[in-house]
Amino acid sequence: MEWSLAEDDALAYSPLFLPNFRPFPMRVYLTGFMASGKSTVGPEAAARLGQPFLDLDRLITAHAGRSIPALFAEEGEARFRELERDLLRRTATTDDLVVALGGGALLDDANRAFAKEHGLVLYLEAPVDTLLGRVTGDDTRRPLLEDDTGTRLPRDEQRTRIEAMLDERRPAYEAAHHTLDADRPVEEVVGRIVEVVTAQAEPA
C-alpha cells in the first residue's frame, strides 16, 4: 500500500501559517520517553508552524489494522519495529512535517541516523516522577509497563522499569539536535518547539 499525506487518516492538517515566510523544507521529529508529551504538543506545534502533524505510532496501527498492544501480542516486537522503520523512511517524501516518534524508535542506529539526516530531532525530556505520574494517570495500554498477562505493573515496579529504560535510552535521546524541557505546561513546550524550529528555518 502506497503511503501519502493526503490519504492517511493518521495525519492531522494544520490551518495556520507563519505570516511572513515558509521555512525551507524541514521535517521535525519529536522523540522522548512514553508520556513525555510528543503526541500532545506535536499537533499544537504543527498548527503554529503551519505544517501537517503525523503520529508514527498511529500510522503503524493504521497500516497494521490493529492496536500496538495487539500487534506486539500477535506478531511480536520485531514486526512492530519493521513497520516503524519502513514508515519512518516514508516521511522523507514530505517536506515541512512534524512527526511524533515512538519512544523506542531512535534506539535503532539506522533510524536515529535517518531522522538526524532528514530532519530536526527534538528530545522532549521529563523526569521520572513526571513520566510516572502521567502514565499512571491514564488508561492507555502500554505493553512495556505490563506483565506477561497484559496486566499493568504495580506503581513501584513501573517506576523501576521506567528508570531502567530511561538509563538505556538516554544516549539515543540525547543524540537529538536539541533537548527541550517537557516538564512544563503544554503551551510553554509548544512555544519552545516553535522558537527552535523557526530559528533553524530562518535564513542566516
From Swiss-Prot:
Annotated residues for binding of ATP: 35-40, 142
Annotated Mg(2+) binding sites: 39
Keywords: Amino-acid biosynthesis, Aromatic amino acid biosynthesis, ATP-binding, Cytoplasm, Kinase, Magnesium, Metal-binding, Nucleotide-binding, Transferase
Catalytic activity: shikimate + ATP = 3-phosphoshikimate + ADP + H(+)
Cofactor(s) required, per the database record: Mg(2+)
Domain of life: Bacteria
Keyword ATP-binding assigned: yes
Cellular localisation: Cytoplasm
GO BP field: amino acid biosynthetic process; aromatic amino acid family biosynthetic process; chorismate biosynthetic process
GO molecular function annotations of the record: ATP binding; magnesium ion binding; shikimate kinase activity
The record's free-text note on cofactor binding: Binds 1 Mg(2+) ion per subunit.
Family annotation (Gene3D superfamilies): P-loop containing nucleotide triphosphate hydrolases
Binding site for substrate: 57, 81, 103, 169
EC number: 2.7.1.71
InterPro entries per the UniProt record, alphabetical: P-loop_NTPase, Shikimate/glucono_kinase, Shikimate_kinase/TSH1, Shikimate_kinase_CS
GO CC terms: cytosol
Pathway: Metabolic intermediate biosynthesis; chorismate biosynthesis; chorismate from D-erythrose 4-phosphate and phosphoenolpyruvate: step 5/7
Chief site of localization: cytoplasm
Stored Pfam families: SKI (PF01202)
Annotated function: Catalyzes the specific phosphorylation of the 3-hydroxyl group of shikimic acid using ATP as a cosubstrate.
PANTHER family noted in UniProt: SHIKIMATE KINASE (PTHR21087), SHIKIMATE KINASE 1, CHLOROPLASTIC (PTHR21087:SF16)
Quaternary structure (record): Monomer.
Family indicated by similarity: Belongs to the shikimate kinase family.
UniProt-recorded name of the protein: Shikimate kinase
